[in-house]
């Protein structure tokens, strides 16, 4: 099953950072021109994935604007805090590194709290902290699509191979996007691209966190997954991993297949 998953997720055992950067920037340029859109939108958290996706997007925009003098493409970085983000300084460091065409902030707290209150008034029950976390992720994506629709831009997602294999994203939240420039990269490969790009070291060495749950703020991804990114990357790059780890990864992959598919129809058989 390991080789099948590697193939399905388009993972290469090794990447050359300069070549990979060029390939993905070119992809973003070509798809934007094909789409007829005016630019890209991305929610920027200050973590590794959005920093990398944002830098690639801004590089694509800068090159397009230099090559096509009669157009003016934009990359809009969107800050999406729930109240006050504890690592806001990292987000600002990411913005300083990327130098987006434009940066705006949409605080999602009022919208999320209103949605939570409406649910609880309608059902008479308390929305779990975990489900409220998913509401945050979906509200963030909704806000990005609002910005994208208003300015005629496409929404960028940050899904990569280590998230895809585990389904470690919110369905119709951070899993929703128009274009996914990091797809096929492992976590360590993403780090190598950021190193090549000269990103501030702390943006890709800090512990990754979705930071969605109020009861467990800053919960590290690896703790939530019960797997380390090193284990996931080793598996995805075709290396041998402990049998118990392999089984855990493959079990999670199968259990989250619905997240990697379009809504199931009567004509689909992948679930059988």
From Swiss-Prot:
Per the record, its GO cellular-component terms are: cytoplasm
Q: Which UniProt keywords apply?
A: ATP-binding, Ligase, Magnesium, Metal-binding, NAD, Nucleotide-binding
Q: What is its EC number?
A: 6.3.1.5
Query: MF terms per GO, please?
Result: ATP binding; glutaminase activity; metal ion binding; NAD+ synthase (glutamine-hydrolyzing) activity; NAD+ synthase activity
What InterPro entries does this protein's entry cite?
A: NAD/GMP_synthase, NAD_synthase, NH(3)-dep_NAD(+)_synth, Rossmann-like_a/b/a_fold
Which amino acids does the record list as binding deamido-NAD(+)?
A: 138, 171, 178, 258-259
Report the pathway entry: Cofactor biosynthesis; NAD(+) biosynthesis; NAD(+) from deamido-NAD(+) (ammonia route): step 1/1
The question of whether Transmembrane helix is a record keyword is answered with no
Decide whether keyword Chloroplast is in the record.
Answer: no
Q: Which GO terms describe its biological process?
A: NAD biosynthetic process
Q: Which residues bind Mg(2+)?
A: 49, 163
Q: Which one Pfam family would you cite for this protein?
A: NAD_synthase
Q: Which residues bind ATP?
A: 43-50, 158, 187, 209
Query: What does the record give as the reaction this protein catalyses?
Result: deamido-NAD(+) + NH4(+) + ATP = AMP + diphosphate + NAD(+) + H(+)
On assembly, the entry states: Homodimer.
Looking up NCBIfam families in the UniProt record yields: nadE, PRK00768.1
Q: What does this protein do?
A: Catalyzes the ATP-dependent amidation of deamido-NAD to form NAD. Uses ammonia as a nitrogen source.
Q: Which family does it belong to?
A: Belongs to the NAD synthetase family.
Q: What is this protein called?
A: NH(3)-dependent NAD(+) synthetase
Protein's organism: Halalkalibacterium halodurans (strain ATCC BAA-125 / DSM 18197 / FERM 7344 / JCM 9153 / C-125) (Bacillus halodurans)
């Amino acid at each position: 099953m390991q080789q099948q998953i590697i193939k399905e997720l388009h993972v290469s055992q090794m990447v050359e950072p300069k070549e990979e950067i060029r390939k993905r920037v070119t992809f973003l340029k070509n798809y934007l021109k094909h789409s007829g859109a005016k630019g890209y939108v991305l929610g920027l958290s200050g973590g590794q994935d959005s920093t990398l996706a944002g830098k690639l997007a801004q590089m694509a925009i800068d090159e397009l604007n230099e090559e096509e003098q009669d157009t003016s493409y934009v990359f809009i970085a969107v800050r999406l805090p729930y109240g006050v983000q504890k690592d806001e300084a990292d987000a600002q460091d990411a913005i300083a590194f990327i130098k987006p065409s434009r940066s705006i902030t949409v605080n999602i707290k009022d919208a999320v709290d209103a949605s939570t209150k409406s649910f609880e008034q309608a059902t008479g029950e308390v929305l779990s902290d975990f489900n409220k976390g998913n509401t945050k992720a979906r509200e963030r994506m909704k806000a990005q699509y609002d910005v994208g629709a208003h300015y005629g831009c496409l929404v960028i997602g940050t899904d990569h191979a280590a998230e895809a294999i585990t389904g470690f994203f919110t369905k119709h939240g951070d899993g929703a996007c128009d274009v996914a420039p990091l797809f096929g990269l492992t976590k360590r490969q993403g780090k190598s691209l950021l190193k090549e790009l000269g990103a501030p070291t702390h943006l890709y060495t800090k512990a990754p966190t979705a930071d969605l749950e109020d009861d467990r703020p800053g919960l590290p991804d690896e703790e939530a997954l019960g797997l380390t990114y090193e284990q996931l990357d080793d598996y995805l790059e075709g290396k041998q991993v402990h049998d118990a780890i392999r089984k855990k990864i493959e079990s999670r992959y199968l259990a989250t297949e619905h997240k990697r598919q379009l809504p199931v129809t009567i004509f689909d058989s992948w679930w059988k």
